[in-house]
């Protein structure tokens, strides 16, 4: 397998998490937690190998690991923690459900937390992570996911809470019911539920994957870091890196946020 790149340094981790946070546009989990996850990977001497989906073997199976829940400061675990690595527990259960080894992981979305989730579990299990995701940014609901758009199933699915619930969804009635199941489990646990779903064949992955987005996260994060180091405008670095436009600028004078139905809500005053 020819890798697009391999992440071995904390500087690469910082660039990737920063870029994913920017491209997540406000969602996608906590970048603080994302950096912590990947720092642990680097500190353990593990490698994060990023691969183009076209480089994987035709019989490969790809799955998507992520968290559903809230990063609102009011969220708290409701019961004692029984499962420390919920994503790994879900990954192991998914492999058992499928009856085969999982070949690679893919980020469900871009964001400081959820992109890091896929990279961490891939490094821990010594499998590659696909250079891409299933959304192209972060989003609050599964409706925006490319798998749903292409009418591909996200089941079977495994959902695990740190409080000890392990739920296997063999099939769901519709995407709204599935979303509700995941949100309810996150509320039941108090903070989040770990999810591993969307087992993709290579043919289906080639339809659904938004290619190159992990590379793009690295590019944007690196551009911002270098702009800061040289005293240049980091916003201009983002605009130039994405061929975008700066619509307005201002200062956030006040903000408040909280949790409603397993989703974070916030209000900003500029």
Locations of regions flagged by a protein language model:
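N-terminal phosphate-binding or glycine-rich loops at protein starts, especially the Walker A/P-loop
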Residues: 5-42
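Short glycine/serine/threonine-rich phosphate/pyrophosphate-binding segments
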Residues: 30-34, 87, 108-120, 136-140
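Glycine-rich oxoanion-binding loops at beta->alpha junctions
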Residues: 54-103
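A structural-propensity feature for long, helix-poor, extended segments
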Residues: 56-73, 144-185
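A short, small-residue-rich loop immediately preceding and capping a beta-strand
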Residues: 101-111, 128-130
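Short, acidic/small-residue loops that bind anionic groups at enzyme active sites
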Residues: 123-143
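Conserved anion/nucleotide-ligand pocket segment
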Residues: 163-213
